[in-house]
Amino acid sequence: MFSPVLFRFSKPNSFLVLLFFLSYIHFLPCAQSQREPCDTLFRCGDLTAGFPFWGVARPQPCGHPSLGLHCQKQTNSTSLIISSLMYRVLEVNTTTSTLKLVRQDFSGPFCSASFSGATLTPELFELLPDYKTLSAYYLCNPSLHYPAKFICPNKGVGSIHQDDLYHNHCGGIFNITVPIGYAPEEGALNVTNLESVLKKGFEVKLSIDERPCQECKTNGGICAYHVATPVCCKTNSSSEVNCTPMMPSGSSAHAGLSKKGKIGIGFASGFLGATLIGGCLLCIFIRRRKKLATQYTNKGLSTTTPYSSNYTMSNTPTSTTISGSNHSLVPSISNLGNGSVYSGIQVFSYEELEEATENFSKELGDGGFGTVYYGTLKDGRAVAVKRLFERSLKRVEQFKNEIDILKSLKHPNLVILYGCTTRHSRELLLVYEYISNGTLAEHLHGNQAQSRPICWPARLQIAIETASALSYLHASGIIHRDVKTTNILLDSNYQVKVADFGLSRLFPMDQTHISTAPQGTPGYVDPEYYQCYRLNEKSDVYSFGVVLSELISSKEAVDITRHRHDINLANMAISKIQNDAVHELADLSLGFARDPSVKKMMSSVAELAFRCLQQERDVRPSMDEIVEVLRVIQKDGISDSKDVVVEIDVNGGDDVGLLKHGVPPPLSPETDKTTASSSNTTASSF
């Protein structure tokens, strides 16, 4: 079986290695029968797997957190999630420590795949040399020539290539893994052949040393995991289980000790004994403090906590024990540290995140409520850690609010919340998946706008994915309340991840609005919400209209260097669109003047932005309607780009004919100028 050691060591003095591991030894009483589930193999159809995997009859502590296997009983197929993508496990070879995998979305037609990134976790998997990685581009400029060209509905023109050559001409890119001998065609891609190749899958080798677990089992132990640390659990004569971290291969405490090494061990043992005595005294002190705190609480002096009371706290100030029981080694191993779970998310200690972020040294950015840092967890996951500015009652409420909202939401375009700290932590920290490509704002008018500009097809796809996420939130009774381009993150494939739910509100389904003091970012705040203190989902629609205007123009929402009437982009957009001057708003580098299909799509999106930015919220479209309209615009644009014909517009007109493409433009300049001019369309300059 596979046996992991995730931490690789050089060859230090043996007594230092022993000291390191002695300091992590824990005595964990548990029944003999609790070992049995980790003796059980994962079985699904013809596939079996043991340590370091878990799943079905093997509880999570029996394997690495990232190696959970799922059995589809209807098809007897096994699946594994890697970097948020679902893979089918075709084979597990325990002799060579290899797996054969195929992406779940490649089981059907290629054009129906998710077109999202496929990055293997390097700490766990190594691609075998018989395979290679190719780049698949999509939403490409249709007027250029590409090798291995393909066209997919809603994804436009695409190409398969081994090098990163077309990122400036295409809206999206993702990786595919193929045999080393596969070569895509020079002309049109043979999609049927590619589908056949992808369905056969590829092989990876686990980047794990199996020898420590073999040694553990030879000595009568059971291999398990605490978070991402492999442990060996043994039963003593009193039927109690001791779990200790497994030592790396080649660093045995008994191999080749010199006289100085033995003296060092004696010194280390004495030091460890003194440390244990000090620890006992510290525990007594902490118990006394907790007892006093309980007395204060009983007198009505309790403090606000960031969580509801459906779980209980353990005796240690940085770990959480969830009420209820788990079978197998779960209760025992969870006591080793802070791997507990609150409402489906992991609870971290402050020290664990301090280590993951290298003492909060890698700042990614900051917002109105906290600074965000880059970090790497022990299991290899890259994370973004939000550190709230202060621990006031308001910050605690925002902390709790973001957890309550994100813990129950699952959507491909919403950022994933991995976990948080406890109320006992020195600081309130939230842990999210790390999104590598920055914010949409950086790509539109920030430091990446010149080096890697986003082409129009990709911008339209970003608008669709953002609208889809907001539509999902509204259907779930949630108003984001801070929709802006700095809260729209992009991964390496330019897939959207909407973030920052500190201001979001749960919206009662039986009410038309809720009354609350206006909050948000200048330039994005709904003027009716600002004036009347009445919040509903149409407030997000207004903010999204500003985002659409940024996608069209590449301009910031507020810019005091512009003419005073155009400082607020919402005002500028309304004025330009109403006066039939979209060309003065549009970023001409996107092809508005030279590509008829791009001009048509950008003009249609401008019409939609115009509707979203109306002063009267009742005439704004819903997010559901916005998603539908954007998809129609994209579909029509792709249809037009399949047969590009360059025409010279001798009249210089900008008429696009929106109605025949299903985009109802109320108050639009062409369909009803009289109505538009009589309406109050002046957006707030807030």
Curated annotation (Swiss-Prot):
Catalytic EC class: transferase
GO CC terms: plasma membrane
Signal peptide (from-to): 1-33
Transmembrane residue ranges: 265-285
Membrane topology: Single-pass type I membrane protein
In-chain residues carrying the UniProt-annotated modification Phosphotyrosine: 432, 529
Domain spans labelled Protein kinase: 358-633
SUPFAM superfamilies, per the entry: Protein kinase-like (PK-like)
Top-level taxon in the UniProt lineage: Eukaryota
UniProt modified residues of type Phosphothreonine: 516, 521
Localization terms from the record: Cell membrane
EC number: 2.7.11.1
Location of Phosphoserine modifications: 515
Cytoplasmic face of the membrane: 286-686
UniProt-annotated catalytic positions: 482 (proton acceptor)
UniProt keywords, alphabetically: ATP-binding, Cell membrane, Glycoprotein, Kinase, Membrane, Nucleotide-binding, Phosphoprotein, Receptor, Serine/threonine-protein kinase, Signal, Transferase, Transmembrane, Transmembrane helix
Reaction catalysed by this enzyme: L-seryl-[protein] + ATP = O-phospho-L-seryl-[protein] + ADP + H(+); L-threonyl-[protein] + ATP = O-phospho-L-threonyl-[protein] + ADP + H(+)
Family: Belongs to the protein kinase superfamily. Ser/Thr protein kinase family.
Name by which UniProt lists this protein: LEAF RUST 10 DISEASE-RESISTANCE LOCUS RECEPTOR-LIKE PROTEIN KINASE-like 1.3
Organism lineage: Eukaryota, Viridiplantae, Streptophyta, Embryophyta, Tracheophyta
